């Protein structure tokens, strides 16, 4: 029989019920945080980690997660995922799990950046175009202007940030004249900040290798009157 004044999480006994009520041990704290987004992210990655490395279909429980010695590291990464809002989250999770990089080092900008650059090169042109247009529309709604004027009117610091975040794909940026015209307005520093994300030499070869996709971008831009 469990004593009524014993913490069900850590087993500690208290002489007064009120003391038990305000008591917060690490196991209880983890239980109370269960519905926090960053904890849910960490739990999801924890489950996927064991699916990949143990080749099992048996899903890890939240109780197993709270008792794991790696709980804090997974939660830290879950918080980092909230911060960066990664492109294709499930692919990103698999990328870091299979990267052979230590768990404690997963929440690193350079690791995500490498993933993002690879993903921008590999994703279908339709997905890249859809995301870029959605980004332009968000900007247009904020500014109360036409989204097709993005490349002409957006302030360059914002454009730099959205290129670095992968929100504006090289498919669109380098695939239409308006995007290239905006790049010509960048300072040397801004060009340097975006260089590794857009890699003009790579994308020039990409357009030659996939002429139908390049034409699709150009025709979409023309139809939308992106200028």
Please report, for each region that a protein language model flagged, where it lies by residue.
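C-terminal recognition-helix end and immediately following basic linker
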Residues: 1-43
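Short, solvent-exposed secondary-structure capping/transition elements
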Residues: 19, 32-34, 86-90, 148
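Intrinsically disordered, low-complexity regions
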Residues: 17, 43-46, 74, 78, ...
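Charged/polar, solvent-exposed surface patches and flexible loops
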Residues: 22, 26, 44, 48-55, ...
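Charge-dense, extended regions
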Residues: 147-227
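Charged, amphipathic alpha-helical linkers/stalks
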Residues: 32-76
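Extended alpha-helical scaffolding regions
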Residues: 59-140
């Amino acid at each position: 029989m469990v004593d009524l004044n014993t913490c069900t999480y850590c087993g500690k006994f208290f002489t007064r019920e009120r003391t038990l009520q305000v008591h917060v041990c690490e196991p209880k704290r983890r239980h109370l945080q269960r519905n926090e987004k960053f904890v849910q992210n960490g739990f999801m990655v924890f489950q996927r980690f064991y699916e990949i490395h143990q080749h099992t279909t048996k899903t890890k429980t939240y109780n197993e997660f709270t008792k794991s010695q790696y709980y804090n590291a997974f939660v830290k990464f879950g918080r980092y995922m909230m911060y960066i809002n990664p492109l294709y989250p499930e692919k990103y999770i698999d990328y870091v799990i299979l990267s052979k990089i230590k768990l404690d080092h997963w929440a690193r900008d350079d690791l995500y950046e490498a993933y993002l650059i690879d993903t921008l090169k590999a994703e279908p042109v339709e997905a890249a175009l859809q995301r870029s247009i959605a980004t332009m529309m968000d900007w247009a709604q904020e500014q109360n202007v036409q989204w097709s004027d993005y490349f002409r009117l957006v302030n360059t610091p914002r454009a730099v940030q959205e290129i670095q975040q992968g929100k504006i794909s090289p498919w669109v940026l380098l695939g239409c004249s308006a995007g290239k015209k905006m790049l010509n307005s960048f300072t040397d520093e801004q060009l340097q900040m975006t260089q590794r994300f857009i890699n003009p030499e790579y994308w020039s070869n990409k357009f030659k290798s996939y002429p139908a996709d390049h034409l699709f971008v150009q025709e979409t831009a023309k139809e939308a009157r992106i200028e």
